[in-house]
Amino acid sequence: MKTMATRKRCKLSRTGPEFENVIKRLLCARTFHTRIGGDLTHGIINRGRRANAEQMGLQGSAQHFNIFPLDLWTQGKKTEVQKREGTDSIPAAGRSGTANQPSIAPHRCLFSRGITALDGLKRGRGCNGAAHLVRGDAWKTKLGEPWVSIALALAGPGAILILELSWFLG
């Protein structure tokens, strides 16, 4: 049964200004699936707090995911296992063929968060919280072809919120 807060959060008008807060709408969704068959709902609801391997639908030992997995890809932090083994590799996080994936450059972190595009300018916040502006389609080249972005049309003629779910989608 939904709580009062969940009910209120899920009753958003598609034409009203509150619709721009797409994160609230995403939190209403029951399930997010990945290609590896994982259920991402709990990982999204955690909103940056610790998520275990089971919550994220990942294969492998839970000790490899002792912090929110996105941090491993965006900030290059080492897990306790990496520190103990003296390795710079990052756990594959359920992906095939990426057992020794190196740390991804910080600019990818910017595009792993919500980004608002208005009049050709992409606005977002990087891992360090600093605001960034990227003109045109530069974000596409930085992310690379395998990454998938979901664009949602919002209220207003030029407003688009791009929610980067590519890390989860593989």
Swiss-Prot record:
Keywords: Membrane, Transmembrane, Transmembrane helix
Any Gene Ontology CC annotation: membrane
Entry annotated with the keyword Cell membrane: no
Membrane topology: Single-pass membrane protein
Transmembrane segments: 150-170
Keyword S-adenosyl-L-methionine belongs to the record: no
Coiled-coil positions: none
Principal localisation: membrane
Annotated compartments: Membrane
Protein name: APRG1 tumor suppressor candidate
